[in-house]
Structure formats: C-alpha cells, structure tokens
Design a protein with these regions (language model features):
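N-terminal glycine-rich, Lys/His-bearing helix-loop that initiates the first secondary-structure elements
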Residues: 1-56
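Glycine-rich helix-loop-beta junction characteristic of Rossmann-like nucleotide cofactor-binding loops
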Residues: 76-78, 101-104
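Conserved N-terminal alpha-helix of the aminotransferase class I/II PLP-enzyme fold
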Residues: 36, 41-94, 119-127
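A glycine-rich helix N-cap at a beta->alpha junction
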Residues: 126-137
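Conserved PLP-anchoring active-site segment centered on the Schiff-base-forming lysine
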Residues: 102-120
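Glycine- and other small-residue-rich loops at beta-strand/loop junctions that grip anionic moieties
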Residues: 34, 88-89, 113-114, 137
Length: 137
C-alpha cells in the first residue's frame, strides 16, 4: 500500500531538479531568457569556466531553466538510473548533429535511411564528407 504521506510521482516531477534555496525561495523557478550571466570576480569566472560550479556562463552551454527541464526529463525517462542525463537543444538539427558528432571519428562511415531529413542529408553528405572525410551510404 502506498504511504499516504509520500508525494506522488506527479508531485515529484513537478518539483524535481528545483532547488528552493536558490532564486530567493521562489515557489516556481524563474524563466531565464538572458544569454549571458555575470560574475562577482575573476575567481568566480575561473571556477565557472573550469566547470567546478555548474554556474551558467552562456545560455547555449548552461541555462538554469533548461537545466531543470533536462533533469525532469531524465528522471522521467530513466526511472531508477541516476547515471543518465537529458540534453535539450535549440533545434532538431542541433540534436542530430550533436549525436552524430559524438558518435563518429574522421574517416568513419555512416549508414542512413534513404529518405533521411534533408538538412541531415546535407550535413552528412556535404559538411562531414568535406570536413572529416566521413562517407555516407
């Protein structure tokens, strides 16, 4: 029997990844729409660039709003596994190219479906062939 005092999965997901000690105790984390973040001094900047703090530097790298969403999606998708993460990208091609670039090396061969998405086809058959010598079938 479920413990009536433990939160439901819906409640856990609604608040997963949110740190109530941040953002002045806001019940709902703010939406960060800025692209750049400031630092109090050079040591703070160095720590951020060395990734010791997980502080945002530039929105395409780390954004607090995006990071919370990634943590929620990872928790939903991975159940009890805590070693997996989710990444959000600004576009489908950003996601496709990130996965492909992570998975291949110069001179590799990629097998793709015949009717692959047009921009993906261009990325594979033009950019990767020219820049990395990757062949595509």
């Amino acid at each position: 029997m479920k413990d009536p005092h433990s939160p439901s999965v819906d409640t856990l997901m609604a608040h997963f990844g949110e740190d109530r000690t941040m953002y002045d105790g806001a019940v709902v984390p703010p939406v960060f729409q800025n692209s750049l973040f400031t630092f109090k001094d050079w040591d703070d900047i160095d720590a951020a660039f060395e990734d010791r703090t997980r502080r945002p530097i530039y929105t395409r790298l780390i954004n607090p709003t995006t990071r919370i969403a990634e943590q929620k999606i990872a928790a939903l998708a991975t159940a009890s596994r805590t070693d997996l993460e989710a990444r959000l990208t600004a576009s489908g091609m950003a996601a496709v190219s990130a996965v492909i670039l992570h998975s291949i090396c110069a001179g590799d061969h990629v097998v793709a479906v015949k009717n692959v998405y047009g921009p993906t086809n261009n990325f594979l058959n033009s950019y990767l062939r020219e820049k990395m010598g990757v062949e595509t079938t």
